């Protein structure tokens, strides 16, 4: 008998959603709706996104917000901030910093980065707690992107970020803190230990 489903599948990425809005809606909303219906009597913990906070500026954000609206009452939605760590997409900022390959940086953006190990620990805490609803999952610390690259001596083009993305995605970890979870991995220490300086 199944008593818990953890649903982490789906399409991610703001930029791709601008080119493929229908794909994002079909996968993230309609596909997940089928899962919700099939497991209607089972507790479901599912991946949402920090982009689901208002205002919704792109198809990815709207698909995640819609997903939360149709989620069953016994479910738990997880609004991930910007996840980094082993096997992260090579086009994401932290992998680019690690290999000294940052072509440009958004001058008006700040980001809350969460290490995948901390994310897994957060999910484990949610499984054990039996809480329901929606929660952010992030480090709870916002990082100005200009300050981040300057700290590591990276010189790159500076551009104003797209209006289709949030300026900041700082997580409110209150629910997770209340059940005993706090992030353990420090972003700057992680980069320092894993960066290729050659």
Predicted regions and their residues:
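Core catalytic loop region at the nicotinamide-binding pocket of NAD(P)H-dependent oxidoreductases
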Residues: 103-105, 126-137
């Amino acid at each position: 008998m199944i008593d818990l489903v953890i649903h982490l599948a789906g399409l991610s990425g703001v930029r791709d959603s601008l080119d493929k809005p229908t794909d994002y809606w079909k996968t993230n909303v309609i596909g997940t709706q089928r899962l919700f219906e099939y497991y209607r009597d089972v507790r479901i913990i599912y991946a949402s996104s920090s982009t689901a906070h208002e205002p919704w500026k792109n198809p990815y954000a709207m698909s995640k917000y819609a997903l939360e609206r149709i989620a069953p009452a016994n479910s738990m939605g997880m609004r991930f901030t910007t996840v980094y760590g082993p096997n992260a997409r090579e086009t994401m900022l932290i992998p680019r910093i690690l290999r000294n390959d940052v072509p440009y940086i958004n001058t008006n953006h700040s980001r809350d980065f969460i290490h995948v190990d901390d994310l897994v620990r957060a999910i484990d805490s949610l499984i054990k707690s039996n809480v329901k609803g929606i929660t952010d999952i992030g480090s709870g610390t916002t990082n100005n992107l200009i300050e981040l690259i300057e700290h590591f001596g990276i010189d790159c083009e500076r551009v104003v970020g797209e209006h289709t993305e949030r300026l900041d995605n700082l997580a409110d970890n209150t629910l997770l803190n209340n059940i005993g979870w706090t992030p353990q991995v420090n972003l700057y220490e992680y980069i320092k230990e894993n960066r290729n300086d050659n």
